[in-house]
């Protein structure tokens, strides 16, 4: 016989009274599924994530049907068990959206017999057991091994609403399954009995148990009725059947005797809300401030068994319904968070019970019936005598179904009360003993009755009838009225808040409310008292206030309280409460003690000191604080107030001292922005739409997104507004002078900075009265955080001194960096950019930071500083201190306590510029302190190619030099192991009259770094690590006689002419004029630069304008003209009829080999055929270059080792008697030709790519093998690029049989002005034939002008680099310079500052990061700073190199002969580091080949340097 399940309240509720009373477990009852549409049963969620199992018994005759199902509510994971294929069980499941795994049992189970089914989950495996006969398993191929389960366990079918919502089902096909028809019983999860939660269209089928021992409440043998008659409710207490006849109108053990005297309570039966027969109901409405009070003082209660019954209807979650007793003898019945709470104490400790409904809460505005019974029972005690003891059995039931039974403690069994019976509330509910709530009831109470063996108190009736012992407080309506609900509100922004009236809680008080949020931080409640001043002989005057606060920090809830004797800070709950669920908070205090409870967990506290009075004089703020906080005093302990963390989330059911507060109405009255009268949690995550712009970091908040803009350079809710930039030049600052002194224990600081200096103050808090500071600064390229709390002044337990943290590295790179500081009491965290945070813990007990100012750029409050940090040069942006963006607040005028002279906007910073007017000007400063490490920074601007910028000598050989050489920066130093040189990397010479930034550093591991603008060069040196400097530091130059004694690697022969600025010497910013020990020459503040600058028409006839510091000069070399502005005629010769010839011969030891040539000449003639200029190589080599006229057109032929190459201007007829200028350039096999202003003719021979690769390869081929290799390449058809051993320049073409007749002017060839030399009777010039000089040598060719011209050539000509076979005449008397080869971190050999070269195969002189010439690159990609560039050769070039090696092997005998033949010639030696495959010899500008020594670390090699191998040139 089955009992149908009952529907109630719109939900399908199983009639689980029998189940919860033990029938499911003890009677062996099963669930009968009729196979009807809409049938379903839901069991509690089975967490089948990892390792778990569930089992049940099944009986059916059906071949198809859904047995069970659960999933993750529409995402990926599910498990389904169905009957299919002739009554066999089929199991399917999936994890992480993988292909579902399926297994089909072999044994049919639709035979009408009971079968045991067990499902075992083990990560990706699931096993199905049927009886003991079959076990099969299957594995899902999933990337994740854990299953996610959100839904309940559905058995027999799915609820209709779930079938209708396809998106909530992971497996859509489950909606189409037939419902199961049959019986299921004994559902277990992990061996524990599982009870159904709810269901529909399912019957509870009673079957006799398999074994004896029925329940005491079972029906009799005849099956008629039960133990309790007339509708009595049976419950089992101590294994005995107990009948509740109170609602039947009968009495007796089995409710069989009619009771004519006792009012029946049948109307309280489940589902029967009608009136009892002909009897009046006693109902009262309570609205939060009303209550009944029955005086028991005349007739005290003394009983061991009693009963309380009542009915209630409410929408509120919390409220006192009934209380009697005091101290340790009481009964308390209340509604707590929508559940019914019972607390009983008979003197030996409280018995607490909480009854919660299966679905929803009891505050559903429906009638619910409560019954509490207490009976004296014998209970077996375990002790020495094993005796039976008397205990009180307590049972509470709600709606006759939900029952909780327990025992009071020890031997106390009597309830005694001579106090009052409170109904619906009390004068101070929070102070009642054992009260779990602090507010009164709001709703309707009906038929409140207390009875025991001696007395029956119908409290509702007594109140209505006006019994003299019953007092009614407030206006009570004796009917059920709708009580206005306390609607929840939502604080949508951190700035929103509500002001509540002052809370008068001097001695006692209580506050309760519910909240829910997902945000980690927020001030929920705050109020403080009148400020009072405390004075002490040892302490300065301090302001103290009483205060009360409840706040959230990092997801935890804290209570803060100070009554004048010290602050307490209590964490109300160990778990975080920002999970989006509702939490009920109840705060109660009585004097110095009290409790704070969250949901059911209560935390007691006792305030320190003697004060018991909480004197709050200000309003009580809910959700946050007003923007204008001038009248508020923030205790340092309330971190959220000082951090400006307002609460964002929902609040409801606020009760203060038991009185409800309609906060929705208050918000409307106050017109509070950002407060919404409802509470809902949006399912969509706001950050999914990427609302944060400009790479802001998004965090999901409560129905909102929160953007972290600190690392973006933008501000605003969505990082949409560009933050203001402040520029600092070392003399600038911004100072925030706060209106009142601040005291904080927690700070959030963030800022962005950009600087090229390794030192400088970023931000600091300063105090006028103490050494307290929180300071951020750059220190050796790192961010340094200093927190100093002045313990001496306030006589606290002194700490070990300032706490410091360091983060970041090489932050002086002129890039934006973000710094974040978080301090919470003693805890420190420092983060730079996205690097790992550095954390620290402060020592001592003192955590309060005092400050009057927030300063940037310069610290002005210096009274308590032992050392003043260096001033800042750079840019600051987005400075935010505790939520205040001060830079933008200052700019916008939002605050009036801001003082600054830093400049708004991003500006190029040139700090304290100084001009060195002449090359003999310099200053001397105090010795540079760079013993263990060094950070130098300066800016310079010049037009000079060379000059000494910085020099400091020291003990022994120690020194440091920074200089310009040919427009490139050199850093030279000696730490004691020999001099080293690092050449700075730059794309072009730096003497371009533009500002350049230079950073030079050395760390403790001897890593040297040179950074010029954005290009970086690094080198590690071995050996000594200390730079021991002693003498003065010279800036701009030294005394004239000192240049001769400078170290050999120093090229400077004169000082620096130009501007220096932003000089930073290891964090010291010297004033180059004021701080100078002495000055020499003309030095002025500021930097005006040249008074005359290059213009488009500064130089005539296509002359090149060269900017000089005191003006400009013109490079006329390729114009054929002369003079300061290239508008004077060049040296001119007339070649008359019969012809003539001017011949220049290089000395035998000075014959250059060139990769690039430049030739220019002016002429006029009427000849159709003639040779103007011819350059020939040494006899037997066959290389030449010839400029000629053919059929009236100009052309050039040249040969550099293989075929003749010709280039001609075919469009211009030049034998017209007019003056023409021809310009020719060659680079390898490529050539250009231009006549006058005609377009440039270009010629690129085929196979040029191979030529470039050959040029790379030839750099690694010794000169002695060059000719052999060239011959081998000639056979292979390769085009060479070197014009070898140039011997003569022949002008006039007489020897070639095509003599020139006409005028030739201003001949220029690779730096030689041959016609000028002829006019000056140069010894290497021979003139024959009819040749006549026109006029005089141009006046511009003075010695000074020539030097200027040659300087111009060096600075602009990159294709006329030459190499001679021996030292030039000008340097012949001086030993060759010896320069070290130093290893950098990237295996770059740092050699000469000039062009590194092979002695034949020469590259144009271009700077590289290590001092080596970079091979020509294809494309525009720059090498990574500080690294050597790698050139990958093609397979054809690889084969070529193999051939080169083979050819070299065949030439050994030839080399031996060559060494003997040329042993008396001047030598140019070089050293190759075989392990690095880099060539390290360097060419001087005058053509000298420099001898070099081994690396300085190889001391033995230095000692034997005279025994090095020598190579000779063929």
Swiss-Prot record:
Ca(2+) 2 binds at residues 772, 789, 848. O-glycosylated; contains heparan sulfate. Heparan sulfate attachment is required for synapse development by mediating interactions with neuroligins and LRRTM2. Residues 1460-1514 are cytoplasmic. Disruption phenotype: No visible phenotype, but mice display subtle behavorial deficits. Females show deficits in nest building and taking care of pups. Mice lacking the alpha-type isoforms of NRXN1, NRXN2 and NRXN3 are born at the expected Mendelian rate, but die during the first day after birth, probably due to neurological defects in the brainstem that impair normal breathing. These mice express normal levels of the beta-type isoforms of NRXN1, NRXN2 and NRXN3. Mice show reduced density of synapses in the brainstem, especially a reduction in the numbers of GABA-releasing synapses. Residues 31-217, 283-480, 487-679, 725-898, 912-1087, 1133-1331 form the Laminin G-like domain. Ca(2+) 1 binds at residues 329, 346, 414. It is found in: Presynaptic cell membrane. GO terms for biological process: adult behavior; chemical synaptic transmission; gephyrin clustering involved in postsynaptic density assembly; learning; neuroligin clustering involved in postsynaptic membrane assembly; neuromuscular process controlling balance; neurotransmitter secretion; positive regulation of excitatory postsynaptic potential. It comes from the Eukaryota. Residues 219-256, 683-720, 1090-1127 form the EGF-like domain. Residues 31-1438 are extracellular. Residues 1481-1507 are annotated as: Interaction with CASK. Glycans are attached at residues 125, 190, 797, 1230, 1392. Pfam families: EGF, Laminin_G_2. PANTHER family: PIKACHURIN-LIKE PROTEIN, SP2353, ISOFORM A. Cell surface protein involved in cell-cell-interactions, exocytosis of secretory granules and regulation of signal transmission. Function is isoform-specific. Alpha-type isoforms have a long N-terminus with six laminin G-like domains and play an important role in synaptic signal transmission. Alpha-type isoforms play a role in the regulation of calcium channel activity and Ca(2+)-triggered neurotransmitter release at synapses and at neuromuscular junctions. They play an important role in Ca(2+)-triggered exocytosis of secretory granules in pituitary gland. This is Neurexin-1. It comes from Mus musculus (Mouse). The lineage of its organism: Eukaryota, Metazoa, Chordata, Craniata, Vertebrata.
């Amino acid at each position: 016989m089955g009992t149908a399940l009952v529907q109630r309240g719109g939900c399908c509720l199983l009639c689980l009274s029998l189940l919860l009373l033990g029938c499911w477990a003890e009677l062996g009852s099963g669930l009968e599924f009729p196979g009807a549409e809409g049938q379903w049963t839901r069991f509690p969620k089975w967490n089948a994530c990892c390792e778990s199992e569930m089992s049940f018994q099944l009986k059916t005759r059906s071949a198809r049907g859904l047995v069970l199902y659960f999933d993750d509510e529409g995402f990926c994971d599910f498990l389904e068990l169905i009957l299919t294929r002739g009554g066999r069980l089929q199991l399917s499941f999936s994890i992480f959206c993988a292909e579902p795994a399926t297994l089909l049992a072999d044994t049919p189970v639709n035979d009408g017999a009971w079968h045991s089914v067990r499902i075992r989950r083990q990560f990706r495996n699931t096993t199905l057991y049927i009886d003991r006969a079959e076990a099969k398993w299957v594995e899902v191929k999933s990337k994740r091994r854990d299953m996610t389960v959100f839904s309940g366990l559905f058995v027999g079918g799915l609820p209709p609403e779930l079938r209708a919502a396809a998106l909530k089902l992971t497996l859509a096909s489950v909606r189409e399954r037939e419902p199961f028809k049959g019986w299921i019983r004994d559902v277990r999860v992990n061996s524990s009995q599982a009870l159904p939660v709810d269901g529909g269209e399912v019957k509870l089928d009673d079957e006799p148990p398999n074994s004896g021992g029925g329940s005491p409440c079972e029906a009799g043998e005849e099956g008629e009725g039960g133990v309790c008659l007339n509708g009595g409710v049976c419950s089992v207490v101590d294994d005995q059947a107990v009948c509740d006849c109170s609602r039947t109108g009968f009495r007796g053990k089995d409710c069989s005797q009619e009771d004519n005297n006792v009012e029946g309570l049948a109307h309280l039966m489940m589902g029967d809300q009608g009136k009892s027969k002909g009897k009046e109901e006693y109902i009262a409405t309570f609205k939060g401030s009303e209550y009944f009070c029955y005086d028991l003082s005349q007739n005290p209660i003394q009983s061991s068994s009693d009963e309380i019954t009542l009915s209630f209807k409410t929408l509120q979650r919390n409220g006192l319904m009934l209380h009697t007793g005091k101290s340790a003898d009481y009964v308390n019945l209340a509604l707590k968070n929508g559940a019914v709470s019972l607390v009983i104490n008979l003197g030996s400790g409280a018995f607490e019970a909480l009854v919660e409904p299966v679905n929803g809460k009891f505050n559903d505005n429906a009638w619910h019936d409560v019954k509490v019974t207490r009976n004296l029972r014998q209970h077996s005690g375990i002790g020495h005598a094993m005796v039976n003891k008397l205990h009180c059995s307590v049972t509470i039931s709600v709606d006759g179904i939900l029952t909780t039974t327990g025992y009071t403690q020890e031997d106390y069994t009597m309830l005694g009360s001579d106090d009052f019976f409170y109904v619906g509330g009390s004068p101070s509910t929070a102070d009642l003993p054992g009260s779990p709530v602090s507010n009164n009831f709001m709703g309707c109470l009906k038929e409140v009755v207390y009875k025991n063996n001696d007395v029956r108190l119908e409290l509702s009736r007594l109140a209505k009838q006006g019994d003299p012992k019953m007092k009614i407080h407030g206006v009570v309506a004796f009917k059920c009225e709708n009580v206005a609900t306390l609607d929840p509100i939502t604080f949508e922004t951190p700035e929103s808040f509500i002001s509540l009236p002052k809370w008068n809680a001097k001695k006692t008080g209580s506050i309760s409310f519910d909240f829910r949020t997902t945000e980690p931080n927020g001030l929920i409640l705050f109020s403080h008292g009148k400020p009072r001043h405390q004075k002490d002989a040892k302490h300065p005057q301090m302001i103290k206030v009483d205060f009360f606060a409840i706040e959230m920090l990092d997801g935890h809830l804290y209570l803060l309280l100070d009554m004048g004797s010290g602050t307490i800070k209590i964490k109300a709950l160990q778990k975080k409460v920002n999970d989006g669920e509702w939490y009920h908070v109840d705060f109660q205090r009585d004097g110095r003690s009290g409790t704070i409870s969250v949901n059911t967990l209560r935390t007691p506290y006792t305030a320190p000191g003697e004060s018991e009075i909480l004197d709050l004089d200000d309003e009580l703020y809910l959700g946050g604080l007003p923007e204008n906080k001038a009248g508020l005093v923030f205790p340092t302990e309330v971190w959220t107030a000082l951090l400006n963390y307002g609460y964002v989330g929902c609040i409801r059911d606020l009760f203060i001292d038991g009185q409800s507060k309609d906060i929705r109405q208050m918000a409307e009255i106050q017109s509070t922005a950002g407060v919404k009268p409802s509470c809902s949690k949006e399912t969509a995550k706001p950050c999914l739409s990427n609302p944060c712009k400009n790479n802001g970091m998004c965090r999901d908040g409560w129905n909102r997104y929160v953007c972290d803009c600190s690392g973006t350079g933008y501000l605003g809710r969505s990082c949409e507004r560009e933050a203001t930039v402040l520029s600092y030049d070392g003399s600038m600052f911004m100072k925030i002078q706060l209106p009142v002194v601040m005291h904080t224990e927690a700070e959030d600081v963030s800022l962005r900075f950009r600087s090229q200096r390794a030192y400088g103050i970023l931000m600091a808090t300063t105090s006028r009265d103490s050494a307290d500071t929180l300071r951020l600064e750059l220190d050796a390229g790192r961010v340094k955080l200093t927190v100093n709390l002045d313990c001496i002044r306030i006589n606290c337990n002194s700490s070990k001194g300032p706490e410091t943290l360091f983060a970041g590295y090489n932050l002086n790179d002129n890039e934006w960096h973000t710094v974040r500081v978080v301090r919470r009491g003693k805890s420190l965290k420092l983060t730079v950019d996205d690097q790992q945070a550095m954390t620290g813990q402060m020592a001592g007990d003192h955590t309060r930071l005092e400050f009057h100012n927030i300063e940037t750029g310069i610290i002005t409050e210096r009274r308590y500083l032992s050392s003043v940090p260096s001033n800042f040069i750079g840019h600051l942006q987005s400075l935010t201190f505790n939520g205040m963006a001060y830079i933008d607040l200052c700019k916008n005028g939002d605050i009036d306590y801001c003082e600054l002279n830093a400049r708004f906007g991003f500006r190029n910073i040139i700090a304290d510029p100084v001009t060195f007017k002449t090359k003999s000007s310099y200053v001397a400063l105090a010795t540079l302190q760079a013993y263990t490490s060094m950070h130098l920074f300066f800016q310079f601007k010049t037009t000079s190619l060379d000059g000494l910028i910085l020099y400091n000598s020291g003990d022994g050989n120690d020194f440091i030099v920074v200089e310009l050489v040919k427009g490139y920066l050199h850093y030279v130093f000696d730490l004691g192991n020999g001099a080293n040189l690092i050449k700075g990397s730059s794309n072009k010479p730096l003497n371009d009259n533009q500002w350049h930034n230079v950073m030079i550093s050395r760390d403790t591991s001897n890593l040297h770094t040179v950074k010029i603008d954005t290009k970086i060069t690094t080198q590690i040196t071995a050996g000594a690590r200390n730079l021991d400097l002693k003498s003065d530091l010279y800036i701009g130059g030294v005394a004239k006689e000192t240049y001769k004694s400078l170290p050999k690697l120093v090229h400077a022969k004169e000082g620096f002419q130009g501007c220096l600025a932003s000089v930073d010497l290891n964090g010291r910013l010297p004033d180059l004029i004021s701080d100078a020990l002495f000055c020499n020459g003309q030095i002025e503040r500021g930097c005006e630069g040249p008074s005359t600058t290059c213009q488009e028409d500064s130089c005539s006839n296509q002359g090149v304008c060269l900017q000089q510091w005191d003006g400009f000069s013109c490079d006329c070399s390729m114009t054929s003209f002369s003079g300061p502005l290239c508008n004077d005629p060049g040296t001119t010769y007339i070649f008359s009829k019969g012809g003539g010839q001017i011949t220049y011969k290089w000395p035998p030891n000075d014959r250059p080999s060139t990769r690039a040539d430049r030739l220019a000449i002016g002429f006029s003639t009427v000849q159709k055929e003639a040779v103007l200029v011819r350059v020939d190589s040494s006899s037997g080599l066959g290389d030449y270059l010839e400029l000629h006229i053919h059929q009236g057109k100009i052309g050039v032929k040249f040969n550099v080792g293989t075929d003749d190459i010709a280039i001609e201007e075919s469009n211009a007829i030049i034998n017209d008697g007019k003056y023409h200028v021809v310009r020719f350039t060659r680079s390898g096999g490529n050539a250009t030709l231009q006549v006058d202003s005609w377009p440039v003719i270009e010629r690129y021979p085929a196979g040029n790519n191979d030529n470039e690769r050959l040029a790379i390869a030839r750099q690694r081929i010794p000169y002695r093998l060059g000719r052999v290799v060239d011959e081998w390449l000639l056979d292979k058809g390769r085009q060479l690029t070197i014009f070898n051993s140039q011997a003569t320049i022949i002008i006039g073409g007489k020897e070639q049989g095509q003599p020139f007749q006409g005028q030739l002017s201003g001949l220029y060839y690779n730096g030689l002005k041959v016609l000028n030399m002829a006019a000056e009777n140069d010894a290497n010039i021979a003139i024959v034939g009819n040749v006549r000089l026109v006029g005089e040598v141009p006046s511009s060719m003075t010695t000074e002008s020539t030097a200027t011209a040659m300087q111009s050539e060096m600075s602009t000509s990159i294709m006329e680099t030459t190499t001679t076979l021996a030292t030039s005449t000008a340097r012949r008397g001086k030993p060759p310079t010896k320069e070290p080869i130093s290893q950098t971190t990237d295996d770059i050999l740092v050699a000469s500052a000039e062009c590194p070269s092979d002695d034949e195969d020469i590259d144009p002189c271009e700077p590289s990061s290590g001092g080596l010439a970079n091979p020509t690159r294809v494309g525009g990609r720059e090498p990574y700073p500080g690294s050597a560039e790698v050139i990958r050769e093609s397979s054809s070039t690889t084969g070529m190199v193999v051939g080169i090696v083979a050819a070299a092997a065949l030439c050994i005998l030839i080399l031996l002969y060559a060494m003997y033949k040329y042993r008396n010639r001047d030598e140019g030696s070089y050293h190759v580091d075989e392990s690095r495959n880099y060539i390290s010899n360097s060419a001087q500008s005058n053509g000298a080949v420099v001898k070099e020594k081994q690396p300085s670390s190889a001391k033995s090699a230095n000692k034997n340097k005279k025994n090095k191998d020598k190579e000779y040139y063929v």
